[in-house]
């Protein structure tokens, strides 16, 4: 029998070699696998996945545009109405998304373009305001460009808010005018809403909504909306309902369904609601009338009343009335003299008999008063007409009247804004009220703003009441003179310290000073070589009693309390611990707070071109300046650059660098120069040395010696 044939190597592969001691060697590794199927390209992925990739990546708008240009599939993924451009809008301007619903079909690419254009336009307008209105207050006709905007107003507002949210100490002039523009835009929008509100039928005018409109108009930069205020009121209603349930679980106000309009008809059930309200408001939540600071304007703003839980009779009454009506008890406002009240009918509904009502004092913890007790409250007898129901318009009129009185009582520049705002509101409700029209004309005349508007108001007054021709004629004459003087004014007055007539001026614009007598902190924004005020002012301020009288330099200063003052040089001194001055007009004159001083904006620097150099020389002598250097220089790889940045030198240096020998000799004179030398040694040791320059040698008499370590 023949032996089987051995398989060939071609069939079985090479024969395995025997290893030592007859052990077989391991088989060779298998050959690498051949190329598999290629992964799908980006364009082959599903559209939803492409959208997700484009939304999740760190892509900006330019990247998305380039991506859409690569192929048809990616262009479809980046379509204008798709998620990609919606995400781009959200990433760039997240605050805008509150204006859209998830189900809206929006051209997001077009929205992005419109918002971008609105931002450019907003910055152009803001940048133009400083040059146009530096010398005068911004008149209402200065906002003409804004009234004719082609872009959506909320896009424009969003850009203004982004300017206001810039780093705190920088961009002060931009913030100043952005705030004014935003103030104007929002007030115009609120005035439109108020006029719509006043045209509604009386039974559709919510007292709470009217109070919110007043709050919004006087505080247009605050985040106040009817929905948030109503939500806070609803929380109080829920607490009252919970307490009421513990007393009477079957009360109709407890079983009331959401959105249901309830009217509780039985007097006893109404009393239970009012008792529960009094407990929750005054005992549990601690609401109370503000007797300590009664004339604070915050007491009139409904949002502040809800925050601080205190107010005046009318604001607390609006809150009390709103809560009661939501719980089914109909209370009515009473325009009682000197003390606003509510009335609660305990007889036939709609009764004209004043004795059929109990009168509720929301300021007095909800106490229920009789007619006689109401008279005791104000100290004198009143006729029946004062117990009648007030309309929503009359309630708003009284609220605005309170703000008007507060504006008249105070005399700072900030309160003039309150007076102007409350006058605007009053005249929006009663446009032909001669008394308030005359007050508005006098206010504008006193402030020296918008003389053309003053003439329009005076002409309107003359048409309404010819008997006012005397006062009208006087104001017309002086207003026309003011307009003529403004036309004759040449360019801005440039003042130089180097001129001989200014040799006695010791201080410069931007320095933070302290008043020797009154102790207030302030910043200089202008100066005169002698007092430029009239004789009456000089006499009233007793300037002649000063040792140097009126023939010494005087300075225009912005004070930390919000006022603007004119101070004699001998009454001012350097503030050795300079701080920011929280004045509302700081951005009108200054662009930045540099830590030890303010940097003038372009308009102010043009008028005082030499002051920056002098200000920088002066601030180097303050302890705060040396402390600032002690913090920066020893740890900085480039002390010179950091020194320049913190001082606001903009690439300049106050004096040429000294030689090495002068540098060494100067160490014994000033602790600051010793500090700088030490800084350079540290950086040389750490191989971070730079060419460090040395500021001018300080006057020894102005440099307090360091003590301790």
Model features per residue range: what roles?
Residues 2-3, 9-11, 16-159, 167:
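Skp1-binding F-box subdomain of Cullin-RING ligase substrate receptors
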Residues 375-378, 410-420:
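Helix-turn-helix repeat elements of alpha-solenoid scaffolds
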Residues 393-410, 432-443, 471-482:
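Amphipathic alpha-helical repeat scaffolds of TPR domains
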Residues 475-509, 518, 531, 643-646:
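Mixed-charge, Lys/Arg-rich low-complexity intrinsically disordered regions
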Residues 520-528:
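Short beta-strand-centered aromatic/proline hotspots
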